[in-house]
Amino acid sequence: MTKDEVKKLRMNSPESLQFLNNATKFYNLMMMYRCAIREIQTKLEVLDDEFSVENNRNPISFIKTRIKQPNSIYDKLQKMGYEFTTENIQTYLNDVAGVRIVCAFIDDIYMISDLITQQDDVKVIEIKDYIKNPKSNGYRSYHMIVEIPVFFAKGKTPMRVELQIRTNGMDFWATLEHQLRYKKGIEEMPGYDEISEELLHSARAIIEADNEMQRIKDKIGMFHEI
């Protein structure tokens, strides 16, 4: 239903009441996803604080969160062949709520993943390791879909959240690559294949730097706790 169609509806008509009911359900669901993000973020901040006290460093550089935009949710459901309903959003989409965890070193990524997995109220739905198995464009990150219970006034609801865990270098590359590659019409421009190769080369350079920093950390760790 378009905005113009909504404006033409009388507020007491069946169509307008149905629209308002669906909108209310959608915004309530987005609130629930925001709450799920806060639950995950709190877990991560607790782990980071504990590690800071015990090891005098923070494995997590920073955390970013996001809720998928309504247009993106709609488009994804359409591609999957489902109607835009709150029931279908909860059933078929795992990445409406997203948390990006950026770490200092590669081994911090797997440590954070293990610590989250070990928590008894966290259910791991799916793992995709794009660090050991990078995408063809050079993208590297560790993805997890987790389900956690969120407590509301009417009871407990299991909510799914996508976690993306990566190093500072991986995040730097992924952010800039997204800005460069998704400019409108870039795929039709001359030299696009060369640009793709250059981006892939830069991704390889960054993982080499990440691996080198990990080796240096491991050497220091033989004599000093890190």
What does each model-identified segment do?
Residues 1-37, 41-51, 162-226:
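An acidic, glycine-/histidine-flanked metal-binding catalytic module
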Residues 56-97:
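A glycine-rich, hydrophobic loop/mini-helix early in the fold
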Residues 50-51, 82, 120-125:
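Short secondary-structure junctions
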Residues 29, 33, 37, 70, ...:
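Generic alpha-helical secondary structure
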Residues 31, 35, 68, 72, ...:
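Charged, alpha-helix-enriched surfaces in structured cytosolic catalytic cores
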